[in-house]
From Swiss-Prot:
Gene Ontology CC entries for this record: DNA-directed RNA polymerase complex
Keywords: DNA-directed RNA polymerase, Nucleotidyltransferase, Transcription, Transferase
Function summary: Promotes RNA polymerase assembly. Latches the N- and C-terminal regions of the beta' subunit thereby facilitating its interaction with the beta and alpha subunits.
Name the record gives this protein: DNA-directed RNA polymerase subunit omega
Enzyme class (EC, first level): transferase
Length: 90
């Protein structure tokens, strides 16, 4: 799994080596503090879990360099969408 770190694709996906290392470090801290993995893998190696989460687009860094998950993003988008209007309410 660590071979993926050598690929430029994963570096470019995150936005550079610094952001990638920041994302990995922050996510490892979360996993060590008991956060659940966002992917199903046949390993308990936390580094492999984090890399698989990145490859599967499950986690990313927001503008404040904090970890966001796809679930967080979906909730933000849903909250920002205007509610559908019922024509009978008009």
């Amino acid at each position: 799994m660590l071979e993926e770190l050598k690929e430029e694709e994963i570096v470019n996906k995150i936005g550079g080596r610094f952001k990638l290392s920041t994302l990995i470090q922050k996510r490892l801290v979360q996993l060590n503090q008991g956060s659940r993995a966002l992917v199903s893998v046949d390993t308990h190696d936390k580094m492999s879990i984090v890399l698989q989460e990145i490859v599967q687009d499950k986690i990313f860094l927001n503008m404040e360099n904090e970890i966001e998950t796809v679930d967080d993003l979906d909730a933000i988008v849903a909250a920002s969408e205007a509610p559908e209007l019922d024509p009978s309410d008009l």
